[in-house]
Structures are given as structure tokens and as C-alpha cells.
Amino acid sequence: MFKFGDEKGQLKCSFCGKSQEQVRKLVAGPGVYICDECIELCNEIIEEELNDDVEFNLNNIPKPREIKKILDQYVVGQERAKKSLSVAVYNHYKRVNSDMKIDDVELQKSNILMVGPTGCGKTLLAQTLARILDVPFAITDATSLTEAGYVGEDVENILLKLIQAADYDIEKAERGIIYIDEIDKIARKSENPSITRDVSGEGVQQALLKILEGTVASVPPQGGRKHPHQEFIQIDTTNILFIAGGAFDGLDKIIKSRIDNKVMGFGADIKSKTEENVGETLKYILPEDLLRYGLIPEFIGRLPVIVTLNELVEEDLVKILTEPRNALVKQYKKFFEMDNVELEFTPEALTAIAQKALERNTGARGLRAVVEEAILDIMYDLPSEPGIAKCVITPEVIKNHKNPELIRVKDKEETA
């Protein structure tokens, strides 16, 4: 058994055995003593282990199949898009983990452009990827950006959002993901270079080039415009993954017109396929189509990985309501469960919700609004109504704002 004191009665550290006189401090615990030197050593060991845990290395990068498997839990459909993103993200972080040069082969940066209709899951895919990889993530809207010197946000402000998401840990931020939404809104107004200044279109594309490619950017710590007498945060964007997304309304017509010009060979076959829907047409996208849409060649070159997403149909929306881990129906059931009420949506009610969202042309993001409108009154009254055991949502509740079927505790006991 360890002695806490020597023959003279002096107290000793229970870990290193040094006496009270040999150390600066001796901290007492229940039946144990520890000196300041041992405390310092313990802190160093813990700090090293924490640093080892957060260090990003190849062994910690999930494989493409693993990434897609997690994406499947949150995003319904879009199989090809999920595969493409899984591979692109895996390759990006392999490049980050290497020295970007392997046997004199330079690994170039592969930013991603996501093209798909409104509400098809572009933002959700980017958010989920960041969660899987446990890296800082920031979303910005391209429509708020303007060329330096004009009213609006400088492009450097998108980096500030990432730095804030990383709690101002610059090293961590330099390996994060930035999602730029509404990227199609900064297309220039015409295919030909403009004589007049296009401060929110081509000007922004030009301003984004360096950041997308990789540069050491100076970011104002408080955001807003730069001025000469302020301090800046320096951040290297070389290893930041940029994902740009947009609906690109009208791009399908540009693709169709290109395909329609090919009247021979495989052209006729492709044409028949593209008549199906916008998502099918977008599969045949080429950089030249984006050029005609209004993106400048240099900007297209900085987004080499193009991922297209399909339009969501009724069946997809019903699955989105019920299948993902964060599905709306599961969330509302949980809320009702907290009031000891069982919530049930009939299959016909789910179809009615999907149809209403499609009518509004809002995609998956419109589902919550439809459900909220339909069950707002019952969510308001239910907590004050004792004795209700079950609430059944029927198509009439969704379509005509009728009251849901309420089953009280007594009725449930009688039918049991």
C-alpha cells in the first residue's frame, strides 16, 4: 500500500513520490495527493490525445460507399448525384491529406457545381456531407454578393461565415466546406462580354475566381467592406471545398437546342430521352451550355465536377415525408407523443401533402409549410384537451382544412 508521507511525516505525491518540499504545490484528494508537476504532465498527455483525435488524415476519411450510405439516411432519391458527390468529396480530402503532389503529379482542386430544380435537395446534400466529415460548414447566397466597391457584400465575407462556423479556428476553417446557393443568379446578362459594368453578375464571377482556385485571402473580422486601417484575418482557401448550387432555370432549353441541332447519329435517340423532364435533360449538360447560360469560361473551369439532380415527383415527396431519419412525419409524431397523443397520417393524406407541394412548385422545402397549415389548429388546441389518445390526419384535413379524427382514451379502450 502506498504511503502518503515519509518517516518524518512529510506528505508525498501519490504518483511520482516526490515530497512536499520537492514540489511547488501538492493537491489533496480523498486518500490521494498529486503534485503540480504530475498535473502538468497529465494536461500535456490529454492535449496530445485531443490533437491526435482532431487531426484529419486519410484513415479518417469515410470511403465513397460509406458517405453515400449516410447520405441515403437523409436524402431520398438522387442516386447518381449522391454517388458523384461521395466520390468528389472523398477525392478532395485525399488531396488535402496528401501534399497535393504525389510523384511529381499535381493534384488539382475539384470544386463542385450542383445543378437541379428548386427544392430537390442541393442544400441538404451539402449540409449532410459537412456533418459526415465533421468539418466546418457555411452557406452563402450568391445574390447578396457584388464586385468590390459596390453596395453589397464582398466575396471575402463568405469566408468569414466559415471562420465563424469553426469558432475562429483558422486551421480548421481551411479544411471546411462552403456552399454557395443561387449561383445561377450571377450569370452575366448575355453570352457576349458586356461593355457596361455587371457588378452582381460577371463582376462577382471574376471576384470569386481566386478564392475558388486557392489563395491567401484577407477577411475583415467584423464583416462588411474592407478599409485600409483595419486588421484582417488571413485564410488560405486552397483546401476549402466549394460547392455551388443553382436551379439554372432555362438551362434545359439550351441543352435541348444543342441536342436538337444534332439531327443525325445518336442525336435523335437522346432527343427522345430529354423530353421526359428537366432532370433527364440536365444529365446531358456540357460546359458549353453553362457558357451560353452566362457563366464565364474561367468560372466554369474552377467548378470541374458537375452534379445534376432530378426533379422530385409525387412518390419522392411521399418518401421524404416518411423515410429519412429527420422525416417530417417522424418529427411531428414525436411532438404529439410528448403530449401523450399518437399521431397518424393516412397514406392518402401523405399523397395529398405531396400533391399540394408540387402544385406550389416548391419541392421538398414546401412540405413543412403544407403540413403546418393543415395541423396548426390541432397543435394549438391539443395540449389543453385532456383525454385524447390518437389524432388521425386524413386527406380532407390537408385539402379542405377539415378537423382531424380524434380518438379519446375511453373510445380507444373500448375498441382495444
UniProtKB/Swiss-Prot annotation:
Organism in which the protein naturally occurs: Halothermothrix orenii (strain H 168 / OCM 544 / DSM 9562)
Chain positions recorded as Zn(2+) binding sites: 13, 16, 35, 38
CC terms in the record's Gene Ontology section: HslUV protease complex
Family as reported in the entry's similarity comment: Belongs to the ClpX chaperone family.
Matches recorded under InterPro entries: AAA+_ATPase, ATP-dep_Clp_protease_ClpX, ATPase_AAA_core, Clp_ATPase_C, Clp_protease_ATP-bd_su_ClpX, ClpX_bact, P-loop_NTPase, Znf_CppX_C4
GO annotation, biological process: cell division; proteolysis involved in protein catabolic process
UniProt name for this protein: ATP-dependent Clp protease ATP-binding subunit ClpX
Known partners and oligomeric status: Component of the ClpX-ClpP complex. Forms a hexameric ring that, in the presence of ATP, binds to fourteen ClpP subunits assembled into a disk-like structure with a central cavity, resembling the structure of eukaryotic proteasomes.
Keyword field: ATP-binding, Chaperone, Metal-binding, Nucleotide-binding, Zinc
Source organism superkingdom: Bacteria
MF-aspect GO terms: ATP binding; ATP hydrolysis activity; ATP-dependent protein folding chaperone; protein dimerization activity; unfolded protein binding; zinc ion binding
PANTHER family in UniProt: ATP-DEPENDENT CLP PROTEASE ATP-BINDING SUBUNIT CLPX-LIKE, MITOCHONDRIAL (PTHR48102:SF7), ATP-DEPENDENT CLP PROTEASE ATP-BINDING SUBUNIT CLPX-LIKE, MITOCHONDRIAL-RELATED (PTHR48102)
Entry annotated with the keyword Hydrolase: no
A Pfam family matched in the record: AAA_2
Residues at which ATP binds: 117-124
SMART domains for this protein: AAA, ClpB_D2-small, zf-C4_ClpX
